[in-house]
């Protein structure tokens, strides 16, 4: 009999317990049932319950009449080196012993450099043989224990340790339960056992300029691409040209003297039909909206501005002059929710109308932030927010987000899709932190950015009024320094997806030069170094330990496992434990860490998988994800001697704990857990 003694303060969300024989999994097959393990069930060319990659010229996946028993088997064939697989998810009882059996046949299988064809059980620790050459039907069998796992993915592979070629058949796969341990769960309270105090910074959050996290999420602006990065009517633009069959007949882009950015749209009005419009605006019941349009015309011109939904229309009449001016607009509240309102700008006289920029916000916004989203953010009570990225920061120039908001240049998002309007920069982020009573944590651009840019950013935030950057900050409306404490030197610079990514050796030098320059500006700031378990960490910690206070680590979990609830949930605490254990090893093995307490800043952690229904990477979360986040927070408690800060990534929409559409906002299942903690 296995006993699990659990300290009360660290009790997990899920306790391993015995599973009655009559109780079966909530989804999928019965315990130990591999559906269609003999490949006999087919519909047209589809082998039921098995998944294979999309069809390609390199490798073929099909059922074949060659069988060990019955009339069909799974087959993979490749003339050249390739990777092929058939996958099937199987539910297994936790704390049980199983026997796996499967039959394999090979014909001219060649592997380079190693491996071959064979079975793999993803989710449990077991070694299975590889096959090469030509072999008749051969039985593969192994016994294994599930532990706390409750699922496995069975993979039939051509190319187990690399690529392979040839032909391979798989048939008659099965699992047999050899026994299940009875788990006695007990709670033990030991007041004499004390761990390191848990840091309040464990409950931090992370927001990045991507998808609908900032724009379409936290920020209240209702108009997308309000500064016209894309020419209206062009692919990618939310703006449309009405009144003409071809956009170029009704509009051109003025690049000679743009109001902001690289060009400004000019409507060529015939006085009757031409209009610029944006659809799919959301309106909440009882909340009016206001904004403005910056315009000029080549002659005095009457312009109608309309907000309409179905047969309901509100119309404003403006008289536009020949120099740029900001024209205010206001629309009364609708008495019901509207998800597809249309905003239109309609010149009423023949001539040309320049539209420099436009803005529209609900009247309940708080300093530009959505009131409903802000209320949910406050409910999280997060002590620290990391900003602005993420991958985004490696291509971000913080100067773009400073100064008059309408004049800040729009940019293509350097790391993700969409347009960066630069409406939310340092001043707006700092105001958000004030509204949430939270601490700011700023990542500097150590990708494409330089040392001076980072040092100037520190001075802009923390310098006195007599410094060059402090003077500029005062000119932009903030005389008093913000005294930002937390700063990171870059983001994930170890990855080839990162703008400006480089070798560990090169980044060691770059980190140290950034740290020296940033500390020269303000020696009181706390610096966080880019980390990644393995050689990167070892090099950074060995060569930069004197120039950091914390080291960053990231992890995300998917649903690539066999589908079991416990397996899904336990991914989070297992990853936290894995990273913490690695850093304990570093402390033992790296001389530069002697006498230092460089703890982990887990500034990105979460589940990250589909379905993405809230914009770019806007994951929908389920109860199983909430349980995993709760288990993760409990694990942070257990690892409190190694983890100082953690930032759930990301807060709104993009893999976020808060979901917001144009009309509504609420906590995701993960948000409900974070709020409780």
What residue ranges belong to the model's regions?
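An active-site-proximal structural segment forming one wall of the substrate-binding cleft
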Residues: 331-336, 340-342, 362-382, 429, ...
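Noncatalytic carbohydrate-binding groove/subsite architecture in carbohydrate-active enzymes
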Residues: 341-347, 351-352, 471, 503-633
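Aromatic/acidic polysaccharide-binding cleft in carbohydrate-active enzymes
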Residues: 209-210, 595-677
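The substrate-binding groove and active-site-proximal loops of carbohydrate-active enzymes
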Residues: 359-367, 408-422, 439-448, 490-508, ...
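Extracellular and organelle-lumenal recognition/adhesion modules and their flexible linkers in secreted
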Residues: 18-422, 439, 449, 455, ...
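Bacterial Sec-dependent N-terminal signal peptides
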Residues: 1-24
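Conserved, mostly hydrophobic/aromatic
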Residues: 205, 293, 381, 433, ...
